[in-house]
Amino acid sequence: MKHIPFLVLAAISAAVGSAPAGAAPLVLADRGRSDFVIVRSAAASPSEVHAADELQSFLEQISGAKLPIRADAGPVGAHEIMLGNNAHLQTLQHGINLDVLGDEGFTMRIVGPHLVIVGGRLRGTMYGVYTFLEEQLGCRWYSSKVSRIPKRERIEIEGLDDTQVPVLEYREPFEFDSFDADWAARNKANSQSARLDEQRGGKVTYFPFVHTFYNLIPPDEFFATHPEYYSLINGQRTCDAAQLCLTNPDVVRLGIERVRQWIRDHPDVRIISVSQNDCGNPCQCPNCQALVQAEGTEAAPVLNFVNQIADAIADESPNVAIDTLAYSYTRHPPRTMQARPNVIVRLCTIECCFSHPLATDDYAQNVSFRDDIVGWGQHCRRMYIWDYVCSFANYLLPFPNWDVLQPNIEFFANNGVRGIFEEGAYQSPGSELEEMRAYVMAKCLWQPDCDVKAVEDDFLQGYYGAAAPMMRDYIDLLENKVRDDHIHMFIWAGVGEPYLADEVLTEANRLFDEAERAVAGEPDVLHRVKVARLGIQYVALQRGGPAQDEPYRVADGRYGPPPDDAYTRLATDFFATADREGVTLFHEGGPNFEDLRRAITAKSAGHPVVTLENPRLRVEIVPDLGGRIVGLWDKERNANLVDPGAPGDPGYPNCGGYQEALSRSLRGPGATAEYTARPTNEGADRPGCVLSVELPNGLRLERLVSIDPQEPVLTIESAATNTAAEPRRFMLQSDLALNMGAPETATFAAPNMPPELFVVPPEQRQVAEWVAPELPGWPVRLLSRERGVGVEVTVEGSDLYRVGRTAYSFQPAVHLGAVSALREVPAGDRLTQKMTVRLTDAAGALPPGPARQHQADVVEAQDDQFSLYREGELSEFVQDPTASDGFAARQLGSDIEWSIQWNYDPRLFEPDTRYTLYGAMKIDKQGDAGKAFDFGVYDSANAAGVCGGSRNAADLTDDQWTTTEFGTFVPGPQQYVWTAPARNGDNVPWVYVDRFWFEKAE
């Protein structure tokens, strides 16, 4: 904030007739009476009219005296509070330089027997009134629901002479509660998202707000006839998760026309966003890339495009600015190109560490950001910041960034920034300390060099009352952990973060217990304390639950572990507080709070079960777990013939039983989806239920599960339909895990094939192999002499491609799987599959062989064992004749997510044995510059990397498989292999993985 020094003001004031030093104070009110009137101009702006009303109202609440409000038509009275630049003020020798105040600045000054509060007509006078009430009379507006309006019998003001002009022209604390109009106005936040109307001074107005390229040139309108308007990627024009061709003259022309139309349609808007889409894939055409090469950054085509639009509207719309982003691949500034004076560049901090101040931290991305803000300051006169202040994966999660809020805002202001958007938990109430964070940010945005600890303590005292000391200790507890251990913190922080160590949570709970006791007699304050506690309760609920080493079971119509009473009580308290607060979301864009409730309820009470039953058979289905069948009971033998998995199995309880996925991987789309279930119309004639789910990728899965009324026969009829408007590439895979007794004792039989024991080779601990299309016919039979039972399986389906079988040396499960071909499925078309399972006797079962000892010299995972993140968007499976099994997984080179992962089972390895991990990988290569990909192994239990590295594009050959060595270590539980592209899509459009394998180290 620009503070005009008091001594200078005092000298000016003495010269022009303001109250002399030592003059008696102004008594605005005394015992419910006042000699003052509030005077405003007869032509006052809407915000000045509102300011007069607010001043009158709050003075009455404070003192009991209701001051009259008058226009400035008559003579000056004996004692006036003069608001705004009115006729009465103009009769005084006030010495106030109105020109320096702008739209939002103000001066509060005693001039003779009068109090003057004057500022910009738009918002300045109103801000002056609120600042007077706050700084002189002690009013506070902590949140939309909590304020402090002190009571005073006598109001005296003396020596007041203060001018404030904000450094930042745009100030937005983007939190859910901060959208309230009164809160925003009273805390001087001119947020574009707040519900600010004209009487509250309006706001900074954007249209549209961000990521607008496809608003500007909609693909639905243009792509079919003009694909050249969109990104050229790998020689093909695309509008799928891409950008515009910004050097195409027609795109420039259409962009100018669209912006002019937006200005006509929205005459009050002062900022038009022309900004990249929220994805990668900038255009690779020669013209766009020539600018990139000349300026050394992908920001060059964007800025060149934006400059042309800005030039076109500069004369006709001089009050409108064009806003764009320096974000992700466009964050680095150009070498020489300058932004036009009517261009705003919004620099985004998304990659930075948010637990250490940007100005001083040595984290690489923070250092890089410092370079970028200095660079953009040399190329742009009007720079804004898009900053991030919470975990967007977990709005409820403790996010100790209090050490950086004020220092970062001051750092921005010191580097010429003129507007700041502080993105927080904007979608729901109840997020972690969001009211406090919004309040503190509002104060820092108005005065970047404010005493932030004083602001925090003031809020804590006013908001939490007697619990304030404990709340202060709680905040310091987390900050000290982050600071002392130098823990970096990012915007997708999760419940396993190292600052949420067990000892920290134990102490936090002790502090909250003490805080709740301190305000036990104040229900509203107690609720606020309990809302603040939601964060550590959320961590406990997500990390805890019933004993993880207890297998799930079906009891009382639900499937889950034995209940944990303490966990259930915690969940009950958590949801009671959250429901009272109105929490609706805990993760940006979803899942919503009801998803969390279902997940926590499932942990504490289990998942609902649908049961089908006849005299011979009982089938147990869990719709919430991908429609998984966890029970196939032979009632005569009281034996469950499916293996539903067990604690320790990767993904448990989302593994085992009968499952389906629309992917090469059984961890793909649909595998863990929450299905809805309804009974069939056949009723008792054929007991059954229909499971269905709409997946976000435009696919629908439907499954009819039914049993014969009398015989032990289960039928599963599945259909995967493409409900999207365009073709979708997918496959339908099913897997039935059967429990046939001790490992390696099951007999496998098929028509025209001699029965054989299905065993694992001695040098391995797992065998997975295809038995079809070579399979000579159906049904396939698995027989168990140990259990005295057999299972007969028949599979039919459209495009049925392969049938496979898998067995392990360390668990009884024997898997039978069927997959369709991977193909483009037209809109409205579908893939189908039908599996029939009949229970039989064990006739023909072979006797078990001798006990076998298994080594694990090599442990291999083909791509069908991978998990793909955002499959179909950032990663996918492809048929590749050069891959070892004809398939590979690939990930988009313009991204940086760990989108290919293999969560391996530690039982596949010999205990306490070192292995070297390798990956068969290749790239599509367009150039030698930069990295090709990163790789590593992550230990989730210890929240630490095990090994890792990267490969450079220059060291790899286009479309040639190469072996990458990851490292040598002892594989353990809760570890996974990952690969990630290096956000270098121009040079490496795709990264491929054929397989991973471990070799026993010498």
List PLM regions with ranges:
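Feature activates predominantly on carbohydrate-active enzymes
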Residues: 51-54, 58-60, 96-304, 314-316, ...
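Catalytic domains of carbohydrate-active enzymes that cleave complex glycans
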Residues: 416, 443-605, 825-836, 840-841, ...
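Acidic (Asp/Glu-rich), glycine- and aromatic
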Residues: 631-633, 710-754
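Acidic-aromatic substrate-binding/catalytic surfaces of carbohydrate-active enzymes
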Residues: 49, 55, 59, 609-676, ...
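Extended, loop-rich substrate-binding clefts of extracytoplasmic carbohydrate-active enzymes
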Residues: 257, 611-613, 658-715, 805-815
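Beta-strand-rich recognition/accessory modules
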Residues: 604-617, 624-626, 634-643, 694-696, ...
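Extracellular carbohydrate recognition and processing domains
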Residues: 941-976
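Short carbohydrate-recognition loop motifs
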Residues: 689-690, 877-897
